[in-house]
Amino acid sequence: MTASDLTVGPARRGVLASAVGAAGAAALAGWTAGAPHPAANDPGPDPRLAAAGATRPFRGARQAGIADSPQTYAAFVALDLAGAVDATVVRRLLTVLTDDIDRLMAGRGPLTDQEPELAGVPAALTLTVGIGPRVVAGGGAPAPAWLAPLPPFTVDRLEERWSGTDLLLQVCANSPTTVAHAQRRLLTGLAPLTTLRWVQRGFREPHEGPGLPMRNLFGQVDGTVQPDVHGLDEALLWCGGDQPAWLREGSALVLRRIRMNLDTWDQVDRLSRENAIGRRLDTGAPVTAPPGADALAPPDLDAQDSLGFHVIDDGAHLRRAHAQAPHERFLRRPYSYDDPPAPGELSDSGLLFAAFMADPVRQFVPVQQRLAEKDLLNIWTTPVGSAVFAILPGAREGEILGEALLA
């Protein structure tokens, strides 16, 4: 996480003040009367307080929660608009959302928030808004060709309850309390206009640095190969001049709910797991990489063993997911989920595969087709949910989200 990702808002002062008050005389014991400096054994400010008060900017050309460092907790919230949808309804919806998001990301509660103390712990909160075809049509704008359900893949066992909707809210923060509070406040504000379709909650390992991969519940290092979205590969993430004008500086989100059969995965030895993945489990390095290599080491897809077989199996996940053209890359921002199991089952766990890109049909579909054809991990994984959303451009000062959509 870079310094530019985070700033410490006014909420930190309140947190610090509370901490000092609670410490009372015990805190003063480390000081001599009138001494200008703390005692030698004073550990200094608690870094957890700074993390709790950390904020990320809302205003700008692009929305937060995409190219910035993933937080530890997430909720993907899908809603349908109630009744007919026209430009008036869309403007009202986006006006309410813009005001509430602006306040919450700054560590302030919305106007109707009766628990503003919870909003005062933003914990790097980001709130990202995506829309479906019905909202685009209601705004009177043309939709991009890719804003539609993905084509069917042979491995899919999709459940209607996890399908696409009119509106998506991605709520991410480094505190589960912050995520829960922000989610509730947004839903309360939208209650007259929307009905809730589904909520998918996820988590991932906390990391200090930006762009670091996570481990999913298979123990697999996930999200290792990412485009340079802050440099040469920006066009792979952000919509440009070949897209509808209202979507420029926006993006596309593909959200796939992938159920992982941990019960049968437990029966697989580590060597077989590494063969299926194409990477070493301990470091995430390709199985062709030399000792000491990390997850960013390039794979040797041509390497063969003494019998003439590929070292990286023809069905290994790494090989099937590997880009075969420069445009077959996208920004992965996945989260794991672990929900209560159904009766008779030991687990209901998996991956919320969230990927951002400029054009899902051109970038994502070819990769997913190769995975569906022959990925060895298909033995233990089943896609049960799939949705595509247009991620709105950001809102500059004085604008609402989706301003250009309604122009």
Segments and roles (model prediction):
Residues 1-10:
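N-terminal secretory signal peptides
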